[in-house]
UniProtKB/Swiss-Prot annotation:
Keywords: DNA damage, DNA recombination, DNA repair, Metal-binding, Zinc, Zinc-finger. Pfam families: RecR_C (PF21175), RecR_HhH (PF21176), RecR_ZnF (PF02132), Toprim_4 (PF13662). SUPFAM superfamilies: Recombination protein RecR. The keyword Transferase does not apply. The keyword DNA damage applies. Residues 81-176 form the Toprim domain. GO terms for molecular function: DNA binding; zinc ion binding. GO terms for biological process: DNA recombination; DNA repair. Coiled coil: none annotated. The gene is recR. Gene3D superfamilies: 3.30.60.80, 3.40.1360.10, 6.10.250.240, RecR Domain 1. This is Recombination protein RecR. HAMAP family: RecR (MF_00017). May play a role in DNA repair. It seems to be involved in an RecBC-independent recombinational process of DNA repair. It may act with RecF and RecO.
Amino acid sequence: MQTSPLLESLMEALRCLPGVGPKSAQRMAFQLLQRNRSGGMRLAQALTRAMSEIGHCSDCRTFTEQDVCAICSNPRRQQNGQICVVESPADIHAIEQTGQFAGRYFVLMGHLSPLDGIGPDDIGLGRLEERLQVESISEVILATNPTVEGDATANYIAELCAQHGVMASRIAHGVPVGGELEMVDGTTLSHSLAGRQPFRF
């Protein structure tokens, strides 16, 4: 079936989104054109502005329109002395939703992966080391993902922290709240046993 070149172009563009295949892209394109053209225009405008105006914070590397993001420029956060290292800006959002962290962040935009040619410079560790040297940092909390690459990245950063006399800690991994032990995989259960805590009354 021969379709409009513009329609084909729209469907192809939509396929750049994660989890969107040919059928999903087709449904989205038809939905926008048939029922929600105003929504499509808003989407196009928002995408154009975001792609041209959103960059990276010069301190933590998260997404922002400013040179320094709102979290990094917050005086209370600066006085806190803690930096939480995460793999992506989405991780910041997840941690902020807990309301349990009052420090600043550093976003790696990935993790170390020598097999893929991703080394320390590719994930901004030079900038992190600069911050360790010049800022008054009391603790670096390593919140990389509990994967082989995430653990290797955390270990590398912990060594960097040790070289600069800064305490490094790793977020706990283990059995999820409300989970049943028989449903938990062996690796997670091993982490839970190794990282057990004394009972507090």
